[in-house]
């Protein structure tokens, strides 16, 4: 990681794949996920996501995270790399930065692009760790945008993410599982099957809370459009 790159918004990254740029809309505070979840007690649940897409070296992580979101239960949409890149480029046109000369875009723009394609009708936001635990347990998988730290590139044979080292850039990924006994989330990444445990990794609640508090965001679709059979 010795090459410094610039993505949209003027952010610098140490890895070309890190293309998530923060874009917060104050109006999002009116659309928290907690108001839609009646349950108060956390539960463990994993939303299966069969495809494992690989973004390659392109900073299209937002598009791939949203494609994985669509491919996961509860409303499965066939996901391909073409779909992921289509969402990514549409998000670039919808975000707050002019032009397409820079790589990267925001999770919010990805949500808008996914909605524009007719795949979902409504999305909400998880503001904090408890919101995310309840959202994954009851509502469905979430698309996260966080800082990616140097220590998160190497997850080891056990497939664990540890938030160590300096920030390397912003990354978007799917969180499709939560375990209450383990106090972990499951991350479904877009870096191929050789990363982590067949493309997935575990991250502890404490580390996740740190990421969320450090300009992190978690978008949760709550009204998905099921594809016609």
Predicted regions and their residues:
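Catalytic-core signature of thiol
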Residues: 1-229
